[in-house]
Curated annotation (Swiss-Prot):
It comes from Chlorobium limicola (strain DSM 245 / NBRC 103803 / 6330). This is 1-deoxy-D-xylulose 5-phosphate reductoisomerase. 1-deoxy-D-xylulose 5-phosphate binds at residues 123, 149-150, 174, 197, 210, 215-216, 219. Belongs to the DXR family. Transmembrane segments: none annotated. InterPro entries: DXP_reductoisomerase, DXP_reductoisomerase_C, DXP_reductoisomerase_N, DXPR_C, DXPR_C_sf, NAD(P)-bd_dom_sf.
Length: 382
């Protein structure tokens, strides 16, 4: 029986994780849950999974939850500190890090320092503080297992192979809802259109990131840290069917790819059960029915966010943290209809150009860059 704590339990990844857990009552148990937006749903999860500790967004949410609780009464915390407490709490062997954005960094670091294995869905943890997190993973001798479908695919395709035999890794991208949209029309695109992802069902922020291709850019940076690959050995190809989740090309010209229907329960289950596998309840892949798999080069002129991410990775230092923070602010402004679709990447670009980068060492130095970029992006948006 593997004990889990889930950070972001009421979000898309959290719900899919609990669905996998629900299918394997003799394999997994829940010791901690943390959420930020839906106290009512968290209460339902508490009644079903009976965790020892939980965390909510703020003190008011904690008071609301106390009034809702039934017979099972876990210890309640709140805020980032509360999520960090749940992440480090005794009992859990693995922590599923699925809080959206840079807010997931501090709790994930707390979990690593407490010796927990990490199932990482929060790519921003590595984007913002990849060097720090990588060093801590080694220091505390924990496993960092990818939950993103692309990185799970690479992880599986690397099994049994030497790093020196890798020519490059290739991340696949669906292309998002605007794959064929002319540049002049992108300026007029609103949140309603951008939120219509052609393949995946995800939260609002990551869906917008997929539309701008910033999500793929963040995944490039994540792949760099997960697999110790330089930017020059990380490629991106648009694959609209989202059947091949990513590939590894070896020095002999052979390419290993992981395929499957687009359902996040598959990579989640792989991370939870690793080094074993477990059932997911998802549909079987029928290649004959699909018929055709197609591939295209990404258009970095129409989607400059991907280029900005490569630039940030190559420049290093605090640039990836600034890229991520500015993007979070810009996406929120777009969802609130304060800026246009193409203004998202423009805001990130201007924030990066204004930044005087430095080499961070301590966690607070990474967070300082994050805070600066948020303020600067808000100033640019006006």
């Amino acid at each position: 029986m593997k004990a889990l704590s889930i950070l972001g339990s009421t979000g898309s990844i959290g719900l899919s994780t609990l669905d996998v857990v629900r299918q394997h009552p003799g394999k997994f148990t829940i010791t901690g849950l943390a959420e930020g937006h839906d106290v009512g749903l968290l209460n339902e999860q508490i009644n079903e999974f009976r965790p020892d500790v939980v965390s909510v967004r703020d003190a008011a949410s904690a008071d609301q939850l106390r009034k809702l609780l039934g017979t099972h009464k876990p210890e309640i915390f709140y805020g980032i500190e509360g999520a960090a407490t749940v992440a480090a709490a005794e009992g859990a062997e693995m922590v599923v890090s699925a809080i959206v954005g840079a807010a997931g960094l501090v709790p994930t670091v707390s979990a690593i320092k407490a010796g927990k294995h990490i199932a990482l869905a929060n790519k921003e943890t590595l984007v913002v503080a990849g060097q720090l997190v990588s060093d801590l993973v080694k220091k505390h001798n924990v496993q960092l297992l990818p939950v993103d479908s692309e990185h799970s695919a690479i992880f599986q395709s690397l099994a049994g192979h030497r790093t020196e035999d890798i020519e490059r890794i290739i991340l696949t991208a669906s292309g998002g809802p605007f794959r064929k949209t002319p540049a002049e029309e992108l300026k007029l695109a609103g949140p309603e259109q951008a939120l219509k992802h052609p393949q995946w069902t995800m939260g609002a922020k990551i869906t917008i990131d997929s539309a701008t291709l910033m999500n793929k850019g963040l995944e490039v940076i994540e792949a760099h840290w997960l697999f110790n690959m330089p930017a020059e050995k990380i490629g991106v190809v648009v694959h609209p069917q989202s059947i091949i989740h990513s590939m590894v090309e070896y020095i002999d010209g052979c390419v290993m790819a992981q395929m499957g229907v687009p359902d996040m329960r598959a990579p989640i289950a792989y991370a939870l059960a690793w080094p074993e596998r477990c059932g997911t309840g998802i549909g079987k892949l029928d290649l004959a029915k699909i018929g055709t798999l197609t591939f295209e080069e990404p258009d970095m002129e129409r989607f400059p966010a991907l280029r900005l991410a490569f630039d940030a990775l190559k420049a290093g230092r605090t640039y990836p943290a600034v890229l991520n923070a500015a993007n979070e602010i810009a996406v929120a402004a777009f969802l609130d209809k304060k800026i246009g679709f193409t203004d998202i990447a423009d805001t990130v670009d201007k924030t990066m150009q204004a930044h005087e980068a430095y080499a961070p060492v301590e966690l607070d130095e990474y967070l300082q860059a994050d805070r600066w970029a948020r303020e600067k992006a808000r100033e640019i948006i006006g």
